[in-house]
Amino acid sequence: MVMVVNPLTAGLDDEQREAVLAPRGPVCVLAGAGTGKTRTITHRIAHLVGAGHVATGQVLAVTFTQRAAAEMRSRLRALGAAVQAVSDFGVVRVLTFHAAAHRQLRYFWPRVIGDTGWQLLDSKFATVARAASSVRLHAGTDDVCDLAGEIEWAKASLIGPEEYVAAVAAIGRDTPLDAAQIASVYAAYEALKARGNGVPGVTLLDFDDLLLHTAAAIENDAAVAEEFRDRYRCFVVDEYQDVTPLQQRVLSAWLGDRDDLTVVGDANQTIYSFTGASPCFLLDFPRRFPDATVVRLERDYRSTPQVVSLANQVIAAAHGRVADSKFQLSGQREPGPAASFHEYSDEPAEAAAVAASIARLIEFGTSPSEIAVLYRVNAQSEAYEEALTEVGIAYQVRGGEGFFNRQEIKQALLALQRSAERSSQTEPNSPLSDVVRGVLEPLGLTAEKPVGSRARDRWEALTALAELADDEVAQHPRLDLPGLLAELRLRADARHPPVVQGVTLASLHAVKGLEWDAVFLVGLADGTLPISRALAHGAESEPVEEERRLLYVGITRARVYLALSWALSRTPGGRQSRKPSRFLNDIAPQMGQNPASSRSRRNRTATLRCRICKNDLTTPAAVMLQRCQICAADVDEELLLQLKAWRLSTAKEQNVPAYVVLTDNTLIAIAELLPADEAALIAVPGMSVRKIEQYGSDVLQLVRCRAVAVRTQT
């Protein structure tokens, strides 16, 4: 007897197959990280179409990002070709919520509204600024950004201007400005849009309005509802744990009294509550649809058992309602290395060590594009941009800008430049660090961290810049403001990484759905993860639990190699008062033991000392040179010039930034140590086996020719 294999279920595990073959009707797929959710839902769509349950044009699948939508469309096309389907699965409509609403509103608007036109606001900034001005609220750029964000949250949460004050009070929400002021701006903003911002016969809509008007059109016009529901019979929603009340309203309008809905999600990956996202719709799905098929996917095909085990331990300690849906993932890959934990004296030491570890991974064959450094807040990227630049490793900042490309840093450098030009008016005895902070204070470097998210991002970036200045002053005690600016601009100019094939630097919020062979989770100190504003709500509060889920998301991005680290102080020589993240208490070796064990960890990561003056090395550059940058060294300046000329020529030939060939500090070390052979060259900081294979013969030839020239001259 010949068994007939269904090509749409071949290769699926038992749980995936159950989800794919579930009958039409409500289906809830609870899919843990790395369990193949996209594979499962695309195969389910293909099964429903291929079995004749629904036509391709009657399926609407919605995602949260264009990238996810494109991936799903691509998989559906490939699946149709692979099984030689009569129907082209690739024509299934796969859109984001906003894109779907945009299409529907353009079609139904004339019937519902009439001749009044509408325009979509690409950005609400200018209109929010006008609204603030109209209610006599003086709002700077950061305030306007925070107001816009708060309006987005309110609309996503189905909270109007008149309910805003009571709503935020009821849930204890931290607001960037006085709640009554925000409500006034919100109301003025809606009024301005309704009047077309002064354009006759036009209504302005923001992206949330697309959803609001689409839902209202279907809810209030029976003909519109009938036409839409006749067109779309089957719905699939990805990442359902991230649905907002507004998006759920649209989905409910689409469905009407039908139940042909498949949702996929993981409440343990709910990390976007600041946008209005709520896992309650996923958690309540079986209650709303008592006959629903519920399938749990717990076989993790992404990560090694070691990574999976760590993720399970982190989420096992969760509290609250979301914790009731926690998974016990089972790693399906071959075993790999155990996750490592590292404690460092300060943040520069942590960054330098991470960069060195990344260099070793690359040396042993890991592609830079398969490595990521993940952190809680964007301002943390600066130390890693600096450290990777020092060792000549290209990087890209995902979901944000490089440190020196951020608008607030450009503004700060311009303000410092203007202050330097007026230096004659500056108190001659003022410490340079105080001068810098005095210049940065009006730009947002306040004594207390602001509440608003945009203002807080600015504050964190300016704080990082001020501490960079402190580092430079520590290395160069006689530095003045023009000299400091020159040093900072040198750092900025050195950072022009390629955008491909580089190490990824990203915040934890920017990496959902992504994965790498090697992941470094950095800055894991209490107050950073969980962040201090979450701790203010209580140790077992929902904001703290969301921070735990952020760590869980970070861990589950790693396929094979995972390192977790933290620093005891922010700056070299600072008071080592930080504690490791409380989320590590039950998972990191030696955590929670006696003080002696804690001291032994610190000793293993003690700060390196200068080989000349024996003082602590406080910057990645100093660590690279194995000496303070101000300590006198016997550098052959002529050789250094020749090395830089060779590097420039080589970089042009390879079409890469010069630092990717060899960094300035590596060239300085070569001109100082004068290595005579490969054995001596490998001892030079920054010279790996790979670098020697690529450039060793050229470098040694330059050193030898220079030695001959020196002997001839003498």
Curated annotation (Swiss-Prot):
Q: PROSITE patterns attached here?
A: HRDC, UVRD_HELICASE_ATP_BIND, UVRD_HELICASE_CTER
Domain of life of the source: Bacteria
Which SMART domains does the entry link to?
A: HRDC
Enzyme class of the recorded protein, top EC level: isomerase
Q: Which GO terms describe its biological process?
A: recombinational repair
- Residues binding ATP: 34-39, 302
Q: Where is the HRDC domain?
A: 633-713
Signal peptide per UniProt: none
Keywords carried by this UniProt record:
ATP-binding, DNA damage, DNA repair, DNA-binding, Helicase, Hydrolase, Isomerase, Nucleotide-binding
Instruction: Write down any Gene Ontology CC term.
Output: cytosol
SUPFAM superfamilies per UniProt: HRDC-like, P-loop containing nucleoside triphosphate hydrolases
Its Enzyme Commission number(s) read 5.6.2.4
Catalyzed reaction equations: Couples ATP hydrolysis with the unwinding of duplex DNA by translocating in the 3'-5' direction; ATP + H2O = ADP + phosphate + H(+)
Annotated region Disordered: the residues are 572-602
Extract one GO molecular function annotation from the record: ATP hydrolysis activity
Which Pfam family, an example, fits this chain?
HRDC
Query: Start and end of every UvrD-like helicase C-terminal domain?
Result: 305-560
Q: Which cofactor does it need?
A: Mg(2+)
Q: InterPro entries under this entry?
A: DExx_box_DNA_helicase_dom_sf (IPR013986), DNA_helicase_UvrD-like_C (IPR014017), DNA_helicase_UvrD/REP (IPR000212), HRDC-like_sf (IPR010997), HRDC_dom (IPR002121), HRDC_dom_sf (IPR044876), P-loop_NTPase (IPR027417), UvrD-like_ATP-bd (IPR014016)
> Which part of the chain is the UvrD-like helicase ATP-binding domain?
10-304
**Job of this protein:** DNA-dependent ATPase, stimulated equally by ss- and dsDNA. Has both ATPase and helicase activities.
Indicate the family of this protein: Belongs to the helicase family. UvrD subfamily.
Write down what this protein is called.
Answer: ATP-dependent DNA helicase UvrD2
Species for this entry: Mycobacterium leprae (strain TN)
Instruction: Provide the organism lineage as a comma list.
Output: Bacteria, Bacillati, Actinomycetota, Actinomycetes, Mycobacteriales
